Design a protein with these regions (language model features):
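A short glycine-centered beta->alpha linker in the GHKL/HATPase_c
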Residues: 81-86
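C-terminal interaction appendages of subunits in large macromolecular complexes
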Residues: 388-407, 422-427, 438, 442-444, ...
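Helical (often loop-to-helix) elements that flank the catalytic cores of nucleotide-handling enzymes
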Residues: 88, 341-354, 557-563, 567-568
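Short adenine-binding "F-helix/F-box" segment of the Bergerat
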Residues: 87-88, 95
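GHKL-family ATPase ATP-binding module
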Residues: 1-14, 21, 43-45, 53-55, ...
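Conserved short strand/loop->alpha-helix "switch" segment adjacent to the catalytic nucleotide/phosphoryl-transfer site
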Residues: 26-45
Length: 648
């Protein structure tokens, strides 16, 4: 970054105001997505985004995020500090403007930040409005300033409280428990996002510290820092997979004023894993930058395969999908004025970005293939293998989709369907084994609840070739029962959900280790082959009780050891032997009436909705738990063995 850019004035004049703050407390979901766990953590991201903007502009190197004992959060950076001088238009300190006016900040002034994070850009004022208390501290110009707020309203004017030998901003806030349904921060959710940000912004050091002690009195802290950026990100994502080539191809360039960074490599798996970002925002739905990358990859590799005569010898027809099997890639572009579209506003719509990424990737990949002929041939061999597997998978897919599930004749024989045909009302229970399946069929509401028993553990799709997945009888039954098919007009591999028959797909397995393993196998299948089901919020996990506790005429179901102990303390005076405790290891141990009343009745059951908080981290975790590479899984078990509950 040039010194001229560094000298850009950052003062009250840089702060532009777009609209007022009144509506945020009345309709918080409009501004942060929701008021549950996701929205709660979004507050932290909004504040961190301000610090990242300072880093992108070249002024910030360190960001500290602290979770305090009372579940308040502090975010501190060593940037320039938010301006505190008088704002002419608003007639108050610029700091107060930033903290109390929605869409106020330097990110709307092109001279201050060339690009800026924050998908909706609601800014720290939104965080202020949704906090019972917020304290803003600024170190700037050798002085320290402070202002406190309650529910978005300042308690006093910005005041100078001493000298400072550093610069930066520190924001501490307490989320409003009367607005959020969840107010306890989860360390791992924050850690995953901050890890991504460290990879996406090489050189920044982000320290996350949790001051809440666990039962043993221990606290947690992690430092996220990457010198090589996306190259290290791809190494991390692929650390649980067997590598096809030893290198990570790392492209870091600037085309026509748009910074483009791409890192990619190939592994021996059958999955395509592309993670894309625009201004640090995870573009889950892709967009023009991903389109440009795919076009460059296909064109460049196909040209190499043709020029080297490898395709001619293989005598197989390849398409774009074949080039991406076993690919892990991260794409990050910085766009001055991004246009987001799609269902969740996480799809980049800027047409010009496609050509920019295509040119950047095409040039760099061509050079790599020329300079690394051995690796180039290994990649093309993998592409040819993928093409042959695709042809085999197409034949298997045709068998799955030959009969229309809507006609009834094609439904699996073991499926006990419901009579209601409106998908919004209907639920499909995936149940472990015929025994539990029989109990569930007897206990269900036949109008809206369908039961599909699964025979034992389904195929581990993480290790299976695509055609083997579709040849699996249990997986074919899931496809057919759901009414979904593979392939849309836009994408031959995409899930076609036009005829989806149920809007709740509920995994219901035994409350033991085997049941958890089956849960994981089914979730791996959904994540790899039916991810849209999860993204639309259709996948749930049932929560059958662990215990039935009885004392005299008192009877209570318990879902946790803590609930069981509370029952023992209340009715058995703390003596477990004086209480009759039945441990349910299998669903088949319950009667149909018990299964209905505890696990299936919509009036009082507990369902856990499956959501993807961080796609890259979910990808890494499924690969680590279910993939071929044993070493990362052994390390995970060794590190987490103390947290395991052993069935006895």
């Amino acid at each position: 970054m040039s010194e001229q850019n560094k000298e850009t004035s950052y003062s009250a004049k840089s702060i532009q105001v777009l609209e007022g703050l009144e509506a945020v407390r009345k309709r918080p979901a409009m501004y942060i997505g929701d008021i549950s766990e996701r929205g709660l953590h979004h507050l932290v991201y909004e504040v961190v985004d301000n610090s990242i903007d300072e880093a992108l502009a070249g002024y910030c190197k360190n960001i500290l995020v602290d979770i305090w004992e009372d579940n308040s959060i502090s975010v501190e950076d060593d940037g320039r500090g938010i301006p505190v001088d008088f704002h002419e238009k608003e007639k108050k300190s610029a700091l107060e403007v930033v903290m109390t006016v929605l869409h106020a900040g330097g990110k709307f002034d092109k001279g201050t930040y060339k690009v800026s994070g924050g998908l909706h850009g609601v800014g720290v004022s939104c965080v202020n409005a949704l906090s019972t208390k917020l304290v803003a501290e600024v170190c700037r110009g050798g002085k320290r300033y402070i202002q406190e707020y309650s529910c978005g309203k300042p308690l006093y004017a910005v005041k100078e409280v001493g000298t400072a030998d550093k610069t930066g901003t520190k924001v501490t806030f307490h989320p409003d428990g009367s607005i959020f349904t969840e107010t306890v921060y989860k360390y791992d959710i924050l850690a995953n996002r901050l890890r991504d940000l460290a990879y996406l912004n090489a050189g920044i050091r982000i320290t996350l510290t949790d001051h809440r002690a666990d039962a043993e009195g221990n606290t947690r802290s992690d430092v996220f820092h990457s010198e090589r950026g996306l190259g290290e990100f791809v190494e991390y994502l692929d650390s649980t997979r067997e590598h096809l080539i030893p290198d990570v191809i790392h492209i870091n360039t600037d085309k026509y004023g748009t910074p483009v960074e791409v890192a990619m490599t190939y592994n021996t798996s059958y999955n395509e894993n592309i993670h894309s970002y625009v201004n640090n925002i995870n573009t889950i739905e892709g967009g023009t930058h991903v389109t440009g990358f795919r076009m460059a990859l296909t064109r460049t590799l196909k040209k190499y395969a043709e020029d080297s005569k490898m395709l001619e010898k293989a005598k197989v027809e390849i398409n774009g999908d074949d080039f991406r099997e076993g690919l892990t890639a991260v794409i990050s572009v910085k766009v001055a004025e991004p246009q987001f579209e799609g269902q969740t506003k996480t799809k980049l719509g800027n047409d010009e970005v496609s050509g920019i990424v295509q040119q950047a990737v095409g040039e760099a990949l061509t050079n790599y293939l020329e300079e690394h002929p051995k690796e180039a041939r290994m990649i093309v061999d993998k592409v040819i293998l993928a093409a042959r597997a695709r042809i085999a998978a197409r034949k298997a897919r045709d068998l799955v989709q030959r009969k229309s599930p809507m006609g009834g004749a094609g439904l699996p024989g073991k499926l006990a369907d419901c009579s209601d045909k409106n998908p919004e009302n209907c639920e499909l229970f995936l149940v472990e084994g015929d025994s539990a399946g029989g109990t569930a069929k007897q206990g269900r509401n036949r109008m809206t609840q369908a039961i599909l028993p699964l025979r034992g553990k389904i195929l581990n799709v993480e290790k299976a070739m695509p055609h083997k997945v579709l040849e699996s009888e249990e997986i074919k039954n899931i496809y057919t029962a759901l009414g979904v098919t593979i392939g849309t007009e836009d994408d031959a591999k995409a899930l076609n959900m036009e005829k989806l028959r149920y809007h709740k797909v509920i995994i219901m397995t035994d409350a033991d280790v085997d049941g958890s393993h089956i849960d994981t196998l089914i979730l791996t299948f959904f994540f790899r082959h039916m991810r849209e089901l999860i993204e639309k919020g259709y996948v749930y996990i049932a929560a059958p009780p662990l215990y039935l506790c009885k004392k005299g005429n008192v009877e209570e179901y318990c879902w946790t050891d803590q609930q069981k102990q509370a029952f023992v303390d209340k009715y058995g005076s703390g003596n477990e032997s004086s209480v009759n405790i039945q441990r349910y290891k299998g669903l088949g141990e319950m009667s149909a009436e018990q299964l209905w009343s505890t696990t299936m009745n919509p009036e009082n059951r507990t369902l856990r909705q499956v959501a993807i908080e961080n796609v890259a981290q979910a990808d890494y975790t499924f690969s680590m738990l279910m993939g071929d590479d044993v070493a990362p899984r052994r390390q995970f078990i060794e590190e987490n063995a103390t947290y395991a509950t052993i069935d006895t």
